[in-house]
Amino acid sequence: MRVSLTLAALLVAGAPVAALAQAPAAAPAPSPHELVKALTPSANGSATTRGIRVVHGGQAAAPSVSLTVDFATGSATLTPQAKKVLGSLGTALKNPKLAGDRFRIEGHTDTVGTPAYNQALSEQRARAVASYLEQTYAIPAARLEPVGMGEHGLAVPTPDQTPEARNRRVVVVNKGA
């Protein structure tokens, strides 16, 4: 009986630790509505919050969204999860609010590998995303500008040769009409 109680106590005490050790679930793909909202330019670079209108001086930053687009390791092959995320993006880009705009598709990598390798890989991945949107959602190529950023513009600054999933991403920037 004592062994059973001790074993049960260990299992209960270890359950929270085991839960923490599990890999985090992939973040759900943003909805097309969320993407349209994030990528739609605000009028005159102004915003209204609780009745206060804030007008930004100078040029406002272009609306953009950072997406986790999964690729097979070391390749530009889209995973099923990536296609799900890009499905939301493709639907959003066909929305009338965004239909006349052009978009820069920025591919980013982490710092694993040489800078030249990461630059080439990020360019391939940006082109893969643009091609998928063109072929699957009939987004005209003229509306998409794939650009490889390599390991420049890290979301999470890391030393060289550090794998960091949050740095392997695609950023979509609205360039306007």
Name each model-derived stretch.
Residues 1-61:
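N-terminal targeting leaders that direct proteins to extracytoplasmic destinations
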Residues 18, 100, 140-142:
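Secondary-structure boundary/capping positions in well-ordered alpha/beta enzyme cores
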Residues 30, 74, 160-161:
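Glycine-centered loop/turn motifs
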Residues 58-63, 97-98, 163-166:
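Extracellular/periplasmic catalytic domains that process cell-envelope and extracellular macromolecules
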Residues 62-74:
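Acidic/histidine-rich, surface-exposed loop or edge segments in extracytoplasmic proteins
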Residues 69, 101-103, 144, 170:
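Conserved beta-strand core positions
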Residues 71-106, 131-135, 175-177:
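Periplasmic peptidoglycan-binding/anchoring modules of Gram-negative envelope and division proteins
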Residues 108-177:
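Periplasmic OmpA-like peptidoglycan-binding domain that tethers envelope proteins to the cell wall
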